[in-house]
Amino acid sequence: KFQIAGFLHWGYNFWNSGLSRQRLNPWQVTDGNGAFPGGDPFSVYPGPEGPVQSLRMKVFHHGLQDLRALELAQALTGRDVGPEVLPGYGEMTFAQYPQGAEELLAARERLNALVESASC
């Protein structure tokens, strides 16, 4: 619907306060000392052997997998599969969309079944 070409998350490992005035421990201070929403300035935490993925990064990865599965289903069927995967939601926007874990997991199961049946 929106045909968004990409996504930019500006703060992969910004472990500082606003304007980089001081270095912070992101395990203890997740909002840049009040400069950002909690967890927003970084996607990974520092770890002893390299970066540790944040929950935000893991969920974003799942979202990208969902997008790829939707694109595959559309390519296999030749139609918009959104209404089948998320029935009853009508027009979705960036502000109005399904948010419950159960409904999102059920939607993914419907999508998986659609891809499976279209692949046979």
Where are these regions (language model features)?
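Catalytic-core regions of glycoside hydrolase
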Residues: 1-19
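Catalytic domains of carbohydrate-active enzymes that cleave complex glycans
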Residues: 4-5, 21-120
